[in-house]
Every structure is written in C-alpha cells, then in structure tokens.
Design a protein with these regions (language model features):
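Thiamine diphosphate
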Residues: 1-128
Length: 129
C-alpha cells in the first residue's frame, strides 16, 4: 500500500478479521506516524493472524525522503516511536542492519499477534509515482 498515508495497519486489520490466513503488514515509520491510532486499535483487537512490522528509515521515503521528526534527536538510541510500536506486543527491535535477516526469521516464528521493528538506511530514490 505504498502512498496509503498511514492506512496499511487499518487495511491489514480489516483483512485479518475476515480471514484465518496470516496477514503481514509491512509499514514505514513515516506511515506509522501518520496514523498512530492504528497501533492502539491493533493492540486492542489483537487479531491472532496479524503480523505488523515497521521498517524505520527515519524519513517519509515514498514522498521525497523528508525526515521523520520523532527520530531526529534520539537515533541511534531507543526512540519515542519505538515505544509506541511496543504497544502492539510482542515486538522485536533491530537497529543493526546485519541483524535484520535473523530478526525477520524470529519475527515470523512468533506466536500471533506480533509486531516488530527494523532500522534501515534511507535511500531517498524516486518511487515511481
């Protein structure tokens, strides 16, 4: 759902409530900031077939790479936005790129519902829109 401006978790929640199959939502940190209320709703509904994973590159990548203000002052430490993501538990936090493959495997092996977080470098390249 590139360009959905924060709607990916809500769409994933709707899908997960209408199927027994696993639903994987891969969200961006900028997108998450656009609809923080979705994390509260996901936590409260806690669908047993939903994975919500946040890719944190510190910017709104798909619309030009503008920095995400919540991350500017605290990266590489634990950020305020990660604390929000932890509200949808259990979550994993990865800030080292070399850990990402292992973290993804661990994440997918979790008991559902699950949430996760991965820090990535920004590319700020044109997204074709």
């Amino acid at each position: 759902m590139q360009g959905s401006m924060g709607l990916a978790p809500a769409i994933g929640l709707g899908m997960s409530l209408n199927t027994t199959r696993p639903v994987v939502v891969i969200n961006g940190d900028g997108s998450l900031l656009m609809a923080l209320g979705a994390t509260h709703t996901l936590r409260d509904r806690a669908p047993e077939n939903l994975f919500h994973y946040v890719l944190d590159n510190g910017c709104h990548e798909s619309v030009g790479g503008q920095p995400v203000a919540a991350l500017e002052s605290s990266y590489p430490g634990v950020t305020e936005i990660i604390k929000v993501a932890r509200g949808f538990k259990p979550s994993r936090v990865s800030v080292q790129p070399e850990e990402n493959t292992r973290r993804i495997r661990e994440f997918l092996a979790q008991t559902l519902p699950a949430g996760g977080w991965m820090r990535l470098p920004a590319s700020a390249r044109a997204q074709g829109r």
